[in-house]
């Protein structure tokens, strides 16, 4: 119903919305992640990551149905987007497909991570340039939630730019994956709407860090609207 939706929006707003392509969305996501912040919306906010990072950067957005990868390069406070890919790997998709027990059984978790790794391998075989990234930046709800669980609270100022080591991410994954949903609901950093899907989302992030050799990940609250 995309066409009818756009027509209706146009009638209400008096202007026709522009639908961005997948590549353009990836570029905007990358630029927003590295140049946006929480202090100001728009490019190169005072707390943006572009001011403190150098070299090839991979931005990862783990969504409900897919995971988006965006690669770029930072140098001298300037960001350049270079490539993108979409993986049919997502927190809701994988929860519904693999994690049927509460808490998930070990074999369910193994299947979830194995398929995530195989899907990532397919992309890396076609686009090996993603393997050049030396910094991992994660964005959006899944990434922010994992950080909030580690902090024990949700605070945008603490989350933006938060570095978590691979060991810390693995520890959060082990904790969440072995708790029943009722216990996860009492975690002060975990929003109620993410209780059922965060295990798969965290497992996808763990898989990316393991497979691509990232020692840590940075959280960015920058988004498409900051690009």
Where are these regions (language model features)?
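Helical "lid/coupling" subdomains associated with nucleotide-phosphate turnover
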Residues: 1-56, 71-227
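Active-site-adjacent helix-turn-beta-strand microarchitecture at beta-sheet edges
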Residues: 65-66
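Short beta-strand-loop elements within alpha/beta enzyme cores
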Residues: 59
């Amino acid at each position: 119903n995309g066409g009818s939706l756009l027509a209706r929006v146009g009638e209400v707003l008096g202007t026709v919305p522009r639908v961005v392509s997948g590549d353009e969305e990836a570029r905007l996501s990358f630029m927003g992640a590295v140049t946006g912040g929480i202090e100001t919306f728009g490019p190169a906010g005072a707390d943006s990551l572009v001011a403190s990072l150098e070299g090839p950067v991979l931005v990862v957005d783990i969504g409900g149905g897919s995971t988006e990868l965006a690669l770029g390069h930072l140098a001298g406070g300037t960001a350049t987007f270079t490539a993108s890919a979409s993986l049919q790997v997502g927190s809701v998709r994988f929860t519904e497909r693999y994690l049927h027990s509460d808490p998930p059984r070990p074999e369910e978790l193994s299947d979830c991570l194995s398929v995530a790794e195989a899907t990532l391998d397919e992309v890396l075989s076609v686009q090996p340039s993603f393997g050049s990234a030396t910094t991992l930046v994660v964005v959006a709800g899944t990434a922010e939630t994992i950080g909030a669980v580690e902090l024990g609270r949700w605070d945008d100022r603490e989350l933006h730019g938060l570095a978590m080591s691979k060991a810390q991410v693995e520890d959060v994954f082990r904790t969440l994956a072995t708790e029943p949903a009722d216990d996860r609901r009492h975690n002060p950093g975990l929003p109620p709407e993410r209780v059922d899907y965060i295990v798969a989302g965290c497992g996808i992030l763990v898989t990316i860090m393991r497979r691509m050799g990232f020692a840590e990940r940075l959280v960015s609250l920058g988004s498409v609207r900051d690009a």
